[in-house]
Amino acid sequence: MSGLFITLEGPEGAGKSTNREYLAARLREQGVDVVMTREPGGTPLAERIRELLLAPSEEAMAVDTELLLMFAARAQHLAQVIRPALARGAVVLCDRFTDATYAYQGGGRGLSVERIAILESFVQGELRPDLTLVFDLPVEVGLARAAARGRLDRFEQEGQAFFEAVRQAYLQRAGQQPQRYSLLDAAQPLAAVQRAIDALLPGILERCRG
């Protein structure tokens, strides 16, 4: 069995974490070695960087600082978790990866795709996800779900225009590479979203065992 790198992307309140758990359980039922992780974070050091990125602060974080911290956490995560898991043949399910950087720092913050791509190449080399599930939903629905969870982090405190730009960046990337992305309607009831995941399962298992 070869390693497979699957990322789950989408804006706030899209249900990525819940559906990551669901997909992991379905794969494990088939005897697949699954590693669940997230970004920013995934290792003790990367989780400390995550805290810096998400905690509201009186000092405004420069956009380049935010971008570099994202990739610093990613470099540690790749070295300690993702690359070793793929090398042993595991399926890695990651809640957010570099597509989130293109969506949030690119779409939301307005950084150029070229600027992000330089860091992507430097930190990741040739490594890219094999499959990316994009959980899409209207911004107002996602923000309402995020607010219902309680205290908002630094990103969740951004306004609707920011998240509209994030959403459009995700949709644009998915449209450019349909062979890598699967777009799921996350505004549906959870059971319907998970039926859509089930429909992808045979193809994922075939790639695992191919």
Swiss-Prot record:
Residues binding ATP, per UniProt: 10-17
Signal sequence span is none
Enzyme Commission code(s) on record: 2.7.4.9
Tell me which CDD domains the record gives. TMPK
Give UniProt keywords alphabetically. Answer: ATP-binding, Kinase, Nucleotide biosynthesis, Nucleotide-binding, Transferase
Do you know which InterPro entries this protein is assigned to?
Answer: P-loop_NTPase, Thymidylate_kin-like_dom, Thymidylate_kinase
Is Transferase included in the keywords of this UniProt record?
A: yes
Protein name, entry field:
Thymidylate kinase
Q: Which organism is it from?
A: Pseudomonas entomophila (strain L48)
Source taxonomy lineage?
Bacteria, Pseudomonadati, Pseudomonadota, Gammaproteobacteria, Pseudomonadales
